[in-house]
Design a protein with these regions (language model features):
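N-terminal carbohydrate-binding accessory modules
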Residues: 42-80, 389
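Hydrophobic targeting/anchoring helices
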Residues: 240-243, 248-436, 528-530, 540, ...
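Short, acidic/polar
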Residues: 60-73, 144-151, 247-258, 324-332, ...
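Polysaccharide-binding and catalytic clefts of secreted carbohydrate-active enzymes
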Residues: 135, 146-150, 154-289, 293
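A short, well-structured beta->alpha microelement
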Residues: 440-461
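Aromatic-lined substrate-binding rim segments of carbohydrate-active enzymes
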Residues: 66-139, 143, 217-233
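The substrate-binding groove and active-site-proximal loops of carbohydrate-active enzymes
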Residues: 51-61, 86-99, 129-143, 170, ...
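A conserved amphipathic helix/loop scaffold
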Residues: 472-688
């Protein structure tokens, strides 16, 4: 502000009224001028749809085709896309760079107000499908650095650029690189390791998980390196990465460490590739669990479903199929209900050559919208209409926890054929399926729960009253978690433990006949485990509770007996300080999942957990799911009916809220206490 209008003539004994009026008038004038300048320079940010798709760019495409795809995105209110930035399509053999193909895509995106997330995709041998996961050599690393410099500096000023995906789908499926470059990195990493005080009571450690620990480090190191390279040329760049095969690769992801260099965390969610341990009718629930895992991994960062299957499998996919329009709708609302900021389909258009050629697309071979694209557009329109970004997921204080070491031990233990269905609990994937069963059972009560790595749980709270941890099938419980878990129960938390959870420590050292470290909080230790191939039932509160493979009995020292068969104690409850534990060392999760009868497990869980959520089903609803979101005193409930017939479900709702249907793809309806859905329908209700 001009000092002439502030410095009054203090040497005068008296101020003239006219001078004061002039001073005030000038102040008001300058204030108004400042406000006017602000309102003329600050522009409203353009709306970016939560829903978008991959536009696959490759040589041979015409300008008209490229323009058509971005026009289609805009017309369907899906103005966010992802492009794989192939180095092979930019760099000539003589070392010169030609970005003209991708410039056309960026110009088309600008023309139709579509934002682009560019996936960095440097050159490497055999690199057409998912991309390589680590550099092959120091020379390759330097080539990648040159590629990043070229691409980022060229495109960083484009108005269409939203951000960068650091690499496509990190994660090797547990395979540990053994090339010279990786071994050099491993040698450097080993020098940083500190000796641990815990040594499994001095027993010989004949199982070595150092390779798995290195892979966990190596994935993080490479992502951090890429992020640093991008930031050299674009310090304010938006950085993202998409995990994949979450129910197996989860053991090589250190999400809390990734938060240090990411702007958001994402997931690829292709049922035909990634959900093969589930039946098709469970794909929507599997996506919900996938979202819960990524939401937890992201922490305070946003999370995306970076790739979602959009079209048909011909030769690709482990369990090939073509999603229906109803499934597309279910998957979108499942992602939104879990809080996904963006959902991008793979793909809008099919690639023309190589792996997946002619597959996966939302458009047909004449570039016309399929019913899947139309369905996605209807969801996008609704999301904009209700301003969905203002609603946040309501998630119960129920934490289904997993350990990476469980997956390492499970894989190490595979000595024989692991495809025999009678032994599913000990096959690869058994642990995560058992944990998934807990998630599914709660969801079929309308309760959305947390699905988290032990490292992502907040172990530093003074009180855990009202919170529940579920350990289902987590066979390895590392020593570093024993005291935090004890503190959780001590300070008011509820621990539910089933199956052979805590059977081993991190070194595959059996804990129960060598002095069980959690005997104080559980009130006992395992007495024996009997292998009963296939399935069996246990009588629990005058009803049969399905279980699978392992029947554990408890050496009970302090617990209250809950289930007993003859002299065998099968389940106990124990008060420890301000908290409580409930222990049932048989595979209940897999028992419910395999039998397709979750009602008995549902009764057990609802009796043991505190689910302080505003909306629930009045009774267990097999095959029906509900997610709840909240904005102030308004709620969204998202219901999905996977039953083969129409259904009416009774709802437990807050007092004083009234329903209005904002989305129903098959004419569903709602009253103040019920919802009616056709088979395969998604129904979204606004309550206020």
């Amino acid at each position: 502000m001009d000092k002439r209008f502030i410095a009054l003539p203090l040497h005068h004994k008296m101020y003239h009224q006219k001078s004061i009026c002039m001073f005030l008038k000038n102040c008001i004038y300058l204030l108004c001028l400042g406000i006017a300048s602000i309102t003329t320079t600050v522009k409203a940010q353009p709306y970016v749809s939560p829903i978008g798709a991959q536009v696959f760019i490759e040589p041979g495409q015409t300008d008209e085709e490229i323009n058509t795809w971005f026009k289609l995105l805009s017309e369907h209110q899906m103005n966010c896309c992802r492009i794989r930035m192939f180095e092979n399509y930019m760099k000539h053999p003589d070392g010169t760079w030609d970005f003209s193909l991708f410039d056309k895509a960026f110009k088309a995106a600008e023309r139709y107000n579509v934002k682009i997330v560019g996936t960095l995709f440097p050159a490497a041998p055999d690199n057409s499908l998912g991309g390589f996961k680590h550099p092959y050599s120091q020379a390759h690393l330097q080539e990648i650095a040159v590629y990043i410099k070229q691409v980022v500096t060229h495109f960083k000023t484009s108005p269409a650029l939203y951000g960068w995906v650091l690499m496509n789908e990190p994660g090797t499926g547990g395979w540990v690189p053994n090339d010279a470059f990786a071994n050099t990195q491993k040698s450097e990493w080993l020098k940083t390791l500190q000796p641990t005080a815990y040594n499994s009571k001095g027993y010989p450690q004949i199982v070595d998980f150092t390779p798995q620990q290195f892979l966990l480090h190596y994935n993080t190191w490479y992502l951090q390196w890429i992020a640093n390279e991008v930031k050299k040329y674009d310090p304010n760049a938006y950085l993202h990465v998409n995990s994949h095969q979450i129910f197996s690769n989860i053991a090589e992801y250190n999400f809390p460490a990734w938060r240090n260099f990411l702007s958001s965390l994402g997931a690829s969610a292709h049922p035909s590739w990634h959900y093969t341990m589930f039946h098709r009718n469970q794909y929507a629930t599997a996506l919900g669990a996938n979202c819960a895992i990524i939401r937890s991994g992201a922490g305070e960062l946003p999370f995306w479903v970076t790739e979602l299957q959009g079209g048909n499998n011909t030769y690709s996919g482990y369990k090939a199929f073509c999603p229906t329009k109803e499934e597309i709708t279910q998957w979108l609302w499942t992602s939104i209900g879990n809080g996904a900021e963006h959902i991008l389909f793979w793909c809008l258009n099919p690639r023309a050559v190589g792996d997946e050629a002619g597959e996966w697309a939302l458009v047909d071979f004449q570039n016309q919208p399929t019913d899947r694209l139309t369905a996605a557009s209807e969801v996008a329109k609704t999301l904009r209409k209700i301003n969905s970004s203002q609603f946040k997921p309501v998630v119960a204080n129920i934490h289904i926890l997993y350990t990476r070491e469980t997956l390492w031990v499970e894989k190490k233990a595979q000595l024989n054929d692991n495809t025999n269905n009678d032994y599913e609990g000990r096959n690869t994937g058994g642990a995560m399926k058992s944990a998934f069963a807990m998630y599914e059972t709660l969801l079929e009560n309308g309760i959305n729960s947390q699905f988290q790595c032990f490292d992502e749980f907040n172990w530093n709270k003074a009180s855990y009253k009202g919170e529940t941890i579920i350990l289902s099938g987590q066979i390895s419980l590392p020593s570093r978690y024993w005291e935090p878990l004890r503190n959780f129960v001590r300070n008011g938390g509820k621990l539910i433990m089933e199956g052979l959870s805590a059977f081993y420590d991190e070194n595959m050292f059996a804990l129960h006949h060598t002095g069980f470290p959690l005997q104080d909080i559980l009130g006992g230790a395992l007495k024996e485990v009997k292998c009963l191939p296939t399935d069996f039932s246990v009588n629990y509160q005058n009803a049969l509770l399905p279980a699978h493979l392992w029947k554990g009995s408890i050496y009970n020292t302090q617990g209250q007996i809950v289930v007993q068969e003859g002299n065998s104690v099968l389940a106990t409850r124990h008060r420890f300080m301000r908290g409580e534990t409930f222990w049932f060392p048989s595979l209940l999760g897999l028992g419910a999942l395999r039998s397709d009868k979750g009602e008995a497990l549902s009764r057990l869980l609802l009796a043991e957990v505190e689910a302080a959520v505003p909306f629930q089903f009045e009774t267990y609803q097999k095959g029906v799911q509900m997610y709840t979101m909240q904005k102030g005193n308004q709620y969204l409930t998202i219901l999905i009916n996977k039953r083969p017939q129409a259904t009416t479900v009774s709802l437990r709702c807050p007092k004083g809220v009234n329903p209005s249907v904002v989305f129903a793809d098959k004419g569903g309806s709602a009253t103040a206490s019920t919802a009616h859905l056709s088979s395969e329908e998604t129904l979204v209700i606004l309550w206020k």
